[in-house]
Amino acid sequence: MEQAPVSTIHEIGKHDGQSVTIKGWLYNLRESGKLLFPIFRDGTGLLQGVLFKKNVSPELFDLVKNLTQESSVIVTGNVRAEQRAPGGYEMDVTALEVVQRVPENEPYPITPKEHGIEFLMEHRHLWVRSQRQAAILRIRGEIVRSAHEFFDKQGFTLTEPPILTPAACEGTSTLFPVDYFGDPAFLTQSGQLYIEATAMALGKVYSFGPTFRAEKSKTRRHLTEFWMVEPEVAFAELDDIMKLAEDFITHIVKSVLERRRDDLKTIERDLSKLENIDTPFPRISYDEAVQMLQEGHAKGELESRFEWGGDLGSPDETYISSKFDRPVMIHRYPVEVKAFYMEPDPNNSKVALCVDVLAPEGYGEVIGGSQRMGSYEKLLARIHEHQLPEESFKWYLDLRKFGGVPHSGFGMGIERAVAWICGLDHVRETIPFARTLHRIYP
């Protein structure tokens, strides 16, 4: 007898009227008299099986009837269209092999009932199997894929910065120290300084990798370990990377809408919010942002009055971004609240040539970027002002000594982008295994 071809559930519609085999897990099981309705999952979707007692052997019927949740199985059956079934297709099961049966005396811990977030995070290694969490991770995968696609099409070269570094990228952030064979080292906060070097070799570069910040923050937007995509462009000024950033975000959103629409529906995302995203993005100066916040305070919409010179906090970003239906770019923050390497505005030395991109719906900053300081002397002075060790930055200063050019770049936190695009309340669901202030397990 000819063996049935193996299919994924996502592509089951290509086999309508045929016998196929799927490999996956029992997601749920419903019994109705002499009918069994097992629902299988394989990482690409759900498929409802059907077993009518009189049409199958007693052994097969009992085998399926006694299956436990999340037991791994190999299932063969005939596919047919059924509008009422999840995914629009059903399988009349003709054979089933149990790969590993979850024991009845130690059942799968995440049952269909409601569970608290601490319980779910403690069982994150299993929680990722739920339809909602799997959909979020597929959307995350598409965001990463489309990011690589965008920069590849734009002629960028992927270059990998080190994860172990001898110094801080930004002196204001807390570092995770590492003993490097007796010498002090740190887990990277950003690949930016290193890709500034590769930009001087290759022109247009980007990096993608993990970053670490030991900030004792418990907000819904902070992780201690997260992933960033960071482009850097030689001979580019602030306006150039602002244009690059809005094109980049628009590309990602359109890719997710095109390729992961079903997953967005699974997590019940309002698609109209994403379909509005297109260039150009609104642009406001820091001064205009301050005015918005002060007016919000006057109306009683914000508790405290924001004063010029402060950095925008999460409540400030949330307030401003909630006023727009697409990402908004805030540019030219005060020099004092930004990193040492940012170029001051030649028309106003109190502000830096920098930009933050705030996602709409109150999600706040997803991108931070700037034009980098070009003068060796000014950069050296800034390093001293920030009380950073000059010796650690000698190589970075060399970039201004040997053929320095105007250059600019930005960084986008993948998890914050996932949170916004998926409409999530907290970044802990945006990454397979979140690392937060009080969680490093599993």
UniProtKB/Swiss-Prot annotation:
Main EC class the enzyme belongs to: ligase
InterPro entries listed in its UniProt record: Aa-tRNA-synt_II, aa-tRNA-synth_II, aa-tRNA-synth_II/BPL/LPL, Asn-tRNA-ligase, Asp/Asn-tRNA-synth_IIb, NA-bd_OB-fold, NA-bd_OB_tRNA
Listed GO CC annotations: cytoplasm
Subcellular compartments: Cytoplasm
Catalytic activity: tRNA(Asn) + L-asparagine + ATP = L-asparaginyl-tRNA(Asn) + AMP + diphosphate + H(+)
Enzyme Commission identifier(s): 6.1.1.22
Keyword match Manganese: no
UniProt-recorded Gene Ontology molecular function terms: asparagine-tRNA ligase activity; ATP binding; nucleic acid binding
GO BP terms: asparaginyl-tRNA aminoacylation
Keywords attached to this entry: Aminoacyl-tRNA synthetase, ATP-binding, Cytoplasm, Ligase, Nucleotide-binding, Protein biosynthesis
Annotated family: Belongs to the class-II aminoacyl-tRNA synthetase family.
Record HAMAP family: Asn_tRNA_synth
Assembly with partners or alone: Homodimer.
PANTHER family: ASPARAGINE--TRNA LIGASE, MITOCHONDRIAL-RELATED, ASPARTYL/LYSYL-TRNA SYNTHETASE
The protein's name in its UniProt record: Asparagine--tRNA ligase
Organism, as annotated: Koribacter versatilis (strain Ellin345)
Upper lineage: Bacteria, Pseudomonadati, Acidobacteriota, Terriglobia, Terriglobales
